[in-house]
């Protein structure tokens, strides 16, 4: 130990010589190897005066291979204490272009902590990394580089977005010109989509608002809102007057507004905006100032009673006129900008696209606001454009003509109620009318109506709706004159049979004509007229019968068809019948008369032709055999059941023999007055039923109707029973009238209109025509049975027995409604047919048409 220490601490010469020789050999070896490999050697600072020697090498490229060296220092020196000559060299790197060969080391060599004692510290290199560690290290480096690249891409994208927004908004006029000159709409749409995607990713709302305000040449926010919301938001128009004051002229304001609208429509829809941009250029580059002023005044001073819709097709937007641009912009606004519901706006646009392909516009478009009036102030006039303006007067004339025929039908139906009283009076009548003959006078009319209903179907197909109705006017007159001039019962029966035959034809043809001529928008209102006029005819017969005998009343009945006959000559045949006969030009003329000469009837005409073609394809030769199929029997049975319980409730017995019933009841109120009261209630109850039928539901009203009729019929039966066999009921003379009023109200709410309505709802479209004829014929058959047998029932069972029988039938009808009748309120015909039959067919043209019913 002391020897080694003495050597280590010894003086200069002897102890250092072997070390110097070894280091010299090592240096030469490293130099030779480096020259062979093409590496640059950095001069080492070999000091013979120190106990340790340094070799300076440059930091290699990959710091992972030499973790003891920090990668932030370049170039760096690495001190290696190696003394053995057979040790491998430490580190070299290739010579770089920017390396300075003569550059001295920037850091002092690392001295061994044993330097003072003259000893050397041997520090071996760490073991070289495995291939797996090298691969993982390089993967981490690659991911780090990708992350840096992604961050730089985000920064670049943000800068590009801001630059793109400013270019697209600030230089919108240039972009519009380029878009208008280019015919490649796909490129325009791609540009718009990219702009929207970049704009949607932005969270810098203040920057977007600033760019939008930059569009308006640095206008303040109030002006921006005023221009943006003009003709879109009614509230925004209050800024219009202030905006006009700030503009030097109205022309300048309109020019600025049009330019703004054109820019604002940018990137909303390329197919429309692409062409609006062209129109904008044409409208804003008009060099003729006088022509522009005249055109502007013509646009501003528009008529106040604008009712004709603006019909615009995309192909018409190529026009360069200011008027075309203005109307195009309005049409575009009403589809997109008024509604705040984006889904609704898209649906409106899709509807319009479909309509343009078919040559049609939206029937119910969104209302839009006329922008300014003559004095520049906002005028909030809203109108709703449709496919065709409703030219109401011709349709009212058609409905009135048909309704006068309905009035005649009502008068004829109620004739026997007041007429039989005077007809059976030998002091008034020159011939005798027995009780059996009287029952035939009342019952033959429904029997003839059955025959007329069967014959009416083929007649309206071969002669036409109008001609068939017109053909009934003269027989109505003849039948009334035959009754008025009768000298025996046979003439009265002939007149009643002829009148009943005409009633059967009219009850089928009148609603068909009305349904095929009136537009859907007013069909509900005008469709009420025939029923109302029919009840007016009943009331007129009751009132006139109070003052006239049967002969004079028949003369009045002969006069009623005259205005009906005259008006029927003024109206045309239905367009649908002309289409079914292949007379397209006649159908076009009929539509022009009904819809107005200025209306576009081509879309409706094409719809009629398509509907007729579908009906022809679905038509079969054996339509009556279709009724016997299992799927069709259920709806047909329900319809026939409703007709049965409607007539077996005794309504026509009450209507036909009202005066006689009150006379037999011994009421304290005059029988004729009671009859008039019943007629008034019957007339008013029609409107009550129409109001409630779509609110309360069909089945609820049928329940109420059944219960009301059951109670009143049993009370009436009890009254007549007490009058014939029991205590004195003279002080209850008001009871029959009260029961009749409640009975009529109950019938009119439910079993009066609903069987006819549900007949059109539940019958399948394929058999609707033939099934409706069967149901109508069955209804007339039941009417004949009731009216013919009522007086026989009163003789055989007494009045109380007849009313109790009708009440019992109504009680059974209540359970029929509960078990079998479906609820059809608020359901489409397709849904009802799907539920009833499991399939859906195209609904026919008379889906909502029902034969006339005025409580018969």
From Swiss-Prot:
Cytoplasmic side: 1-389, 461-472, 518-527, 573-635, 694-699, 761-766, 822-856
Key word Transmembrane present: yes
Extracellular side of membrane: 411-439, 494-496, 549-551, 657-672, 721-739, 788-800
TM helices/strands, residue ranges: 390-410, 440-460, 473-493, 497-517, 528-548, 552-572, 636-656, 673-693, 700-720, 740-760, 767-787, 801-821
UniProt KW keywords: Cell membrane, Glycoprotein, Membrane, Phosphoprotein, Sugar transport, Transmembrane, Transmembrane helix, Transport
Segments forming a coiled coil: none
Functional description taken from the UniProt entry: Low-capacity facilitative transporter for trehalose. Does not transport maltose, sucrose or lactose. Mediates the bidirectional transfer of trehalose. Responsible for the transport of trehalose synthesized in the fat body and the incorporation of trehalose into other tissues that require a carbon source, thereby regulating trehalose levels in the hemolymph.
Protein name: Facilitated trehalose transporter Tret1
UniProt organism field: Drosophila erecta (Fruit fly)
């Amino acid at each position: 130990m002391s020897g080694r220490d003495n050597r280590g601490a010894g003086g200069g010469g002897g102890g250092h010589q072997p070390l110097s020789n070894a280091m010299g050999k090592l240096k030469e070896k490293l130099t030779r190897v480096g020259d062979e490999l093409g590496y640059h050697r950095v001069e080492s600072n070999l000091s013979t005066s120190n106990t340790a020697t340094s070799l300076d090498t440059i930091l290699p490229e990959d710091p992972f291979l030499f973790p003891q060296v920090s990668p932030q220092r370049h170039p760096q020196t690495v001190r290696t204490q190696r003394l053995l000559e057979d040790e491998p060299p430490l580190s070299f790197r290739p010579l770089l272009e920017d390396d300075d060969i003569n550059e001295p080391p920037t850091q002092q060599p690392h001295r061994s902590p044993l330097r003072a004692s003259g000893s050397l510290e041997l520090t071996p290199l760490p073991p070289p990394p495995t291939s797996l560690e090298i691969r993982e290290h390089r993967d981490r480096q690659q991911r780090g580089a990708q992350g840096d690249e992604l961050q730089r891409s985000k920064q670049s994208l943000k800068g590009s977005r801001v630059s793109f927004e400013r270019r697209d908004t600030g230089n919108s006029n240039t972009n519009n010109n380029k878009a208008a000159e280019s015919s490649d709409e796909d490129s325009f749409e791609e540009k718009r989509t990219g702009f929207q995607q970049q704009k949607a990713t932005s969270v810098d709302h203040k920057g977007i608002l600033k760019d939008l305000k930059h569009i308006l040449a640095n206008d303040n926010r109030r002006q921006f809102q005023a221009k943006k919301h003009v003709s879109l938001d009614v509230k925004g128009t209050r800024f219009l007057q202030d905006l006009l004051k700030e503009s030097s002229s109205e022309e300048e304001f309109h020019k600025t507004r049009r330019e703004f609208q054109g820019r604002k429509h940018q990137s909303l829809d390329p197919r429309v905006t692409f062409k609006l941009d062209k129109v904008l250029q044409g409208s804003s580059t008009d060099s003729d100032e006088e022509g522009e002023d005249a055109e502007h005044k013509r646009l501003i001073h528009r008529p106040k009673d604008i009712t004709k819709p603006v019909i615009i097709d995309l192909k018409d937007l190529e026009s360069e006129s200011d008027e075309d641009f203005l109307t195009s912009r309005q049409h575009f606004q009403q589809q997109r900008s008024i509604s705040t519901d984006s889904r609704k706006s898209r649906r409106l646009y899709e509807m319009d696209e479909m309509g343009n392909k078919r040559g049609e516009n939206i029937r119910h478009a969104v209302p839009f606001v006329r922008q300014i009036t003559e004095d520049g102030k906002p005028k909030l006039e809203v109108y709703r454009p449709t496919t065709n303006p409703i030219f109401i007067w011709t349709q009212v004339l058609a409905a009135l003509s048909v309704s006068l025929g309905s009035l005649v039908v009502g008068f004829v139906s109620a004739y026997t109620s007041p007429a039989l009283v005077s007809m059976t009076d030998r002091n008034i009548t020159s011939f005798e009318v027995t009780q059996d003959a009287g029952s035939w006078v009342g019952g033959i009319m429904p029997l003839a109506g059955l025959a007329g209903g069967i014959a009416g179907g083929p007649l309206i197909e071969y002669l036409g709706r109008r001609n068939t109705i017109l053909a009934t006017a003269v027989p109505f007159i003849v039948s009334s004159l035959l009754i008025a001039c009768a000298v025996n019962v046979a003439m009265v029966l002939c007149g009643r049979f002829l009148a009943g035959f005409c009633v059967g034809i009219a009850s089928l043809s009148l609603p068909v004509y009305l349904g095929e001529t009136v537009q859907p928008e007013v069909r509900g209102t005008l469709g009420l007229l025939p029923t109302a006029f029919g009840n007016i005819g009943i009331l007129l017969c009751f009132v006139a019968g109070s003052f006239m005998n049967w002969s004079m009343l028949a003369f009045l009945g002969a006069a009623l068809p005259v205005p009906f006959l005259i008006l029927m000559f003024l109206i045309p045949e239905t367009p649908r019948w002309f289409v079914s006969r292949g007379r397209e030009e006649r159908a076009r003329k009929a539509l022009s008369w009904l819809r107005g000469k200025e209306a576009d009837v081509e879309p409706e005409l094409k719809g009629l032709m398509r509907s007729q073609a579908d009906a022809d394809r679905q038509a079969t030769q054996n339509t009556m055999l279709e009724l016997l199929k299992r799927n069709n029997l259920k709806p047909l049975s329900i319809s026939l059941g409703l007709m049965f319980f409607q007539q077996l409730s005794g309504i026509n017995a009450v209507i036909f023999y009202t005066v006689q019933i009150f006379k037999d009841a011994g009421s304290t109120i005059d029988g004729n007055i009671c009859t008039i009261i019943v007629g008034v209630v019957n007339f008013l109850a029609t409107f009550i039923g129409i109001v409630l039928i779509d609110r309360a539901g069909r089945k609820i009203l049928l329940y109420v109707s059944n219960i009301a009729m059951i109670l009143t019929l049993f009370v009436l039966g009890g009254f007549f029973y007490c009058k014939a066999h029991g205590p004195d009921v003279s002080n209850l003379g008001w009871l029959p009238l009260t029961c009749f009023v409640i009975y009529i109200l109950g019938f009119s709410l439910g079993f009066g209109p609903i069987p006819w309505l549900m007949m059109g709802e539940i019958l399948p479209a394929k058999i609707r025509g033939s099934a409706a004829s069967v149901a109508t014929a069955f209804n007339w058959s039941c009417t004949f049975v009731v009216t013919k047998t009522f007086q026989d029932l009163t003789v055989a069972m007494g009045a109380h027995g007849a009313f109790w029988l009708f009440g019992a039938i109504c009680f059974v009808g209540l359970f029929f409604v509960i078990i079998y009748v479906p609820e059809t309120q608020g359901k489409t015909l397709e849904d009802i047919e799907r539920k009833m039959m499991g399939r859906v067919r195209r609904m026919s043209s008379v889906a909502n048409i029902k034969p006339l019913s005025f409580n018969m």
